[in-house]
Amino acid sequence: MDAYQQYIHKSRYARYLPEEKRRETWEETVDRYVDYWGSNLPSLEKQRVRKAIYDMDVMPSMRALMTAGEALDRDNVAGFNCSYLPIDHPKAFDEMMYVLMCGTGVGFSVERQYVQKLPEVAETFHETDTVINVADSKIGWAKSFRE
């Protein structure tokens, strides 16, 4: 691995190991990824996949490489590089916010056949004393956006 690749790995994909007070090595990151996804692979196939990633002959989803383990167990959205949704319902906005907060890119369509399904936006707004309480979590922020 050259210096640039090492920097990218350490700064983006290597987990911090608190008990060892350091970040993962490339080999440890690959092991974490392969161990996470490889439980259904025969041993020989798992070894081949591990070697191919170690040697950088192939690259898995980098989002999944970053999040494999507890983070991906908590929320599988974090394993995707990108997603898509049409903007055809108000709920699309909070869904988009949630997916973005998980670190996944979102492509969207605002084509006529989709946006014509949205409710009209009022031309004027009235004063309100409404308070929106936001739970400090990805889900909390997305739900508050819906309010």
Residue ranges of model-derived segments:
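Extended catalytic cores of very large enzyme megasubunits
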Residues: 1-147
